[in-house]
Amino acid sequence: MTQMPAGDVPGMGRRQFMNLLTFGSVTGVALGALYPVVNYFIPPRAAGSGGGTSAKDELGNAVTASGWLSTHPAGDRSLVQGLKGDPTYLIVEGDDAIGSYGINAICTHLGCVVPWNSGANKFMCPCHGSQYDATGKVVRGPAPLSLALANVSVENDNVFVSQWTDTDFRTGEKPWWA
C-alpha cells in the first residue's frame, strides 16, 4: 500500500466538520444529563474508617459525642440523621456513653416516623398505633417487623452510623433490613 503525499490528503470538509460538531454537542449534553442518574445509583462513600456516615443533627451539623452527652441525659433517645438520611435514634446509655446501636425511626408498617414516648418508655407510631419497646422490638401491631438497627461508633469524638450486619439481638435472627 502506498501513502499519499501530504499535499494530496484532503482536508476536513464543511459537512464533516458540522457532523463532528453536532455529534460532540449531543454527546456532551447526553453525558451531562446522565451524570446525576448514574450518580444516584452509586452509594455514598464512607466518612469514618468503620464504613459509616457521620451522624447529623437537625441543622445538618456533624454530631460530636461530647456535645451530645452534654445536652442529653442518660436514657435519652433523640433523633439524628443516619444512614441514607433516615431519622435514627441515638441512645444515651450513661453520663458518658452513647449506645453502640441506633434505632431507625421509620415504622415498618407504612413508613411514618415513630416518636419516642418517654412516659410510656416505648416508641408509639402516630399513624396506626404500632408500638415498639425501648430497643425497637415490635410489641403491638399492625407493624409486622421491629424497627431497623444501625451500628453507632465514636471516633475522635465524632459519631458515625453504619449498616447493622450482626444478628438482631432482639430476635436472635438475621436482620430483615440487611
Swiss-Prot record:
<keyword id="KW-0411">Iron-sulfur</keyword>
<keyword id="KW-0479">Metal-binding</keyword>
<dbReference type="GO" id="GO:0015979">
    <property type="term" value="P:photosynthesis"/>
</dbReference>
<dbReference type="InterPro" id="IPR036922">
    <property type="entry name" value="Rieske_2Fe-2S_sf"/>
</dbReference>
<dbReference type="GO" id="GO:0009496">
    <property type="term" value="F:plastoquinol--plastocyanin reductase activity"/>
</dbReference>
<keyword id="KW-0793">Thylakoid</keyword>
<dbReference type="Pfam" id="PF00355">
    <property type="entry name" value="Rieske"/>
</dbReference>
<keyword id="KW-0472">Membrane</keyword>
<dbReference type="GO" id="GO:0046872">
    <property type="term" value="F:metal ion binding"/>
</dbReference>
<dbReference type="InterPro" id="IPR017941">
    <property type="entry name" value="Rieske_2Fe-2S"/>
</dbReference>
<keyword id="KW-1015">Disulfide bond</keyword>
<comment type="similarity">
    <text>Belongs to the Rieske iron-sulfur protein family.</text>
</comment>
<comment type="function">
    <text>Component of the cytochrome b6-f complex, which mediates electron transfer between photosystem II (PSII) and photosystem I (PSI), cyclic electron flow around PSI, and state transitions.</text>
</comment>
<dbReference type="GO" id="GO:0031676">
    <property type="term" value="C:plasma membrane-derived thylakoid membrane"/>
</dbReference>
<keyword id="KW-0408">Iron</keyword>
<feature type="binding site">
    <location>
        <position position="109"/>
    </location>
    <ligand>
        <name>[2Fe-2S] cluster</name>
    </ligand>
</feature>
<dbReference type="GO" id="GO:0004497">
    <property type="term" value="F:monooxygenase activity"/>
</dbReference>
<dbReference type="GO" id="GO:0045158">
    <property type="term" value="F:electron transporter, transferring electrons within cytochrome b6/f complex of photosystem II activity"/>
</dbReference>
<comment type="subunit">
    <text>The 4 large subunits of the cytochrome b6-f complex are cytochrome b6, subunit IV (17 kDa polypeptide, PetD), cytochrome f and the Rieske protein, while the 4 small subunits are PetG, PetL, PetM and PetN. The complex functions as a dimer.</text>
</comment>
<feature type="binding site">
    <location>
        <position position="128"/>
    </location>
    <ligand>
        <name>[2Fe-2S] cluster</name>
    </ligand>
</feature>
<keyword id="KW-0249">Electron transport</keyword>
<dbReference type="Pfam" id="PF25471">
    <property type="entry name" value="TM_PetC"/>
</dbReference>
<keyword id="KW-1278">Translocase</keyword>
<dbReference type="InterPro" id="IPR014349">
    <property type="entry name" value="Rieske_Fe-S_prot"/>
</dbReference>
<dbReference type="GO" id="GO:0016705">
    <property type="term" value="F:oxidoreductase activity, acting on paired donors, with incorporation or reduction of molecular oxygen"/>
</dbReference>
<keyword id="KW-0001">2Fe-2S</keyword>
<keyword id="KW-1133">Transmembrane helix</keyword>
<feature type="disulfide bond">
    <location>
        <begin position="112"/>
        <end position="127"/>
    </location>
</feature>
<keyword id="KW-0812">Transmembrane</keyword>
<feature type="domain" description="Rieske">
    <location>
        <begin position="71"/>
        <end position="161"/>
    </location>
</feature>
<feature type="binding site">
    <location>
        <position position="107"/>
    </location>
    <ligand>
        <name>[2Fe-2S] cluster</name>
    </ligand>
</feature>
<keyword id="KW-0813">Transport</keyword>
<feature type="binding site">
    <location>
        <position position="125"/>
    </location>
    <ligand>
        <name>[2Fe-2S] cluster</name>
    </ligand>
</feature>
<dbReference type="GO" id="GO:0051537">
    <property type="term" value="F:2 iron, 2 sulfur cluster binding"/>
</dbReference>
<dbReference type="InterPro" id="IPR005805">
    <property type="entry name" value="Rieske_Fe-S_prot_C"/>
</dbReference>
<protein>
    <recommendedName>
        <fullName>Cytochrome b6-f complex iron-sulfur subunit</fullName>
        <ecNumber>7.1.1.6</ecNumber>
    </recommendedName>
</protein>
<dbReference type="InterPro" id="IPR023960">
    <property type="entry name" value="Cyt_b6_f_Rieske"/>
</dbReference>
<feature type="transmembrane region" description="Helical">
    <location>
        <begin position="20"/>
        <end position="42"/>
    </location>
</feature>
